[in-house]
Amino acid sequence: MSWSTFMHNERPHVHRHAPEFSFSKISFDDRDLPRKLKDTKQRPKAYYAYDVTSQCVVGFAYNRNKNVDLVVDCFRDMFRLMERNGWNCPAQVEVENHLMSQWKDSFLKAGTLFPFVRFCAPLNSQEKFAEPLNGAKKRSVEHKNHLGIGRFYAKNEKYRAESKKISDEYNDTYEEKQYYTWEQLIQEDMNDVHEFNHSLHPNQKKYPGMTRWQVLESNMNPTLQPVDKAILYRFIGEHVETSIKRNSYCRVNYTDLWLSSPEVLDRLAPNNNQVDAYYLPDEDGNMGDVYIYQNGVLLDKLSNVGTFNTAEAEQTEADKLIMTNQNKLISQFDAMTKKEAIAPVVVMKAETAQKIAKATAKPVQVETEEPDMNTLIAQFSDYKGRGVADT
């Protein structure tokens, strides 16, 4: 008997129950979609993020390979959902070691972004809550909606799928009855996720008549904190190398974004205006909030002040507001340069210089007064009395 078989079948295991509130714990896991592609005869890889309380899929992503991009896209999808709904940051995430360990000392370090982070032990699939939820989605939705879902060794006939064996030199090649395009498989799985989320929660005794999504929305943990976007975007956002131009703005993806204040310039390294910009694009590719770093240190959150119409005859109230905001930032820069300007050099009169040269330094006598012992004793007694009174 292998160690894995012994651990899953014979070794005692802990008994747990789900939390009371949504977003108290999010569990991540990957899986292969059950049907194969026409072009590669391989199964697409999917990555899901489940809320443990509601069992909702709150983030998902797809790739042809199980790689880091798959994980990053799943995190991005989850945080986009949170942004759209105004939800705060999950209290805990439960992740695997294989693809997540590279972030153990960065944003997946407990207390950095998430208060609690659990890395599940390798080869211990029963530890992750996402594992049985993958099965629940497959049994309740996928088997109902699609043909060819199952495994050839399944005990239950309705969960069994058959393949045609091909006689070749490998003697281990099987052909599916039907293959599918990438677009079809991904769209159908996204539809399955939506159906799974909006089906009744399995614990109808506790949540009568409520769907998984309704449980998610109505039971959000009240102690959750807002997402620290500056940290999040640095690790899973898009990265653009740029520079601060004219002491006022950075150009990111052909868009000029202004510094929040000219005082940000004081935080730059000497003679270095090169910075790194990070942002998380939405579903339409829009940038949203953009943060700039230099040498790993957060400098500022940029803002899109916009441009105004140069023709006064065509200016709207929005144009005037943009012009006012730009002029405010320019005025702040002018005030800062005036405040930090070096005083102008003046020419000293010749006779004043001669007087200074002829002047002789004289020692200054400082009179010291010997302390009166009676006064010191009285002061000490008064200090001690006040200390006793304070207690």
What are these regions (language model features)?
Residues D29-P34, Y50-S54, R64-K66, N97-L99, ...:
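Short, flexible loop/turn elements at secondary-structure junctions
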Residues Q55-C56, V297:
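Residue-level signal for well-ordered, solvent-exposed loop/turn and beta-edge residues enriched
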Residues F60-G86:
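Active-site beta-loop-alpha junctions of metal-dependent nucleic acid enzymes
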Residues Y180-E340:
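C-terminal, beta-rich DNA-binding module of retroviral/retroelements integrases
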